[in-house]
Amino acid sequence: RRRGVEMLFHPGTHDCVAYDMAWGGAEHPDIPVYLGANTGHGKRGHPRLERGQSNKSAFLLTHFFPEEISGRLLVPPKVEHALVDDAIEVIVEFPDGYEPEGGSIWWMFDRAPDGSPQYLSEPIPDDNFAEMHYDDRRGVWCAEIELDANAEQIDFFSIYLSRVKHNGRGYETYLS
C-alpha cells in the first residue's frame, strides 16, 4: 500500500490453493476479499451464490480509469459478533462514504481445521444462508444466526453488493 498498489483477493471458501483464509483475514484485514460460498477449483458453488459478479472488471476499470467511473468499490468493514440468547448477532460496519446496496451471510458449524481434506470438501449447507439487514438506528448491517446447541464453533462470512459504472455499463461487485 505504501507504493500505491491496490489489491483484491478473490479466492473461494473451499479452494485448495487458498485454504488459509482465516489466517489471511486476521493478519491482513485491510486487503479487500471476495469469497464465493462453496467455490474453488472444480467446485460448483452454493445455490445462493452471487451470479454475474464483475469484481475483476470493476477492479481493473477503477484502477486504470478512475476518472471514468461512477460509484466506488467497497473497503473491508469492521465485523463484530455478540451472543444473544441462543443465537449470535453479526454486526458489520462500513466506513463513512462506503454504503453497500445489500448483503448476505453464510455459516458452518464445527468446520474442520484449515487445509484439511474435510475443510475443502464439506460444503456450507444450503440452508445456512440469510440476508443481512441494515439497522438505521445503529448504522450497521446485522444478522442473527441461531446456534446449534451441539456445536463447539461457528465460521461465518458475509458478502456485500455495490455497483460501479463505466461508459454507462454497470458492474456488480461484491466484498466479503
PLM ranges: what are they?
Residues 11-13, 37-39, 92-94, 107-109, ...:
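Active-site proximal loops enriched in glycine and acidic residues that flank catalytic Cys/His/Asp
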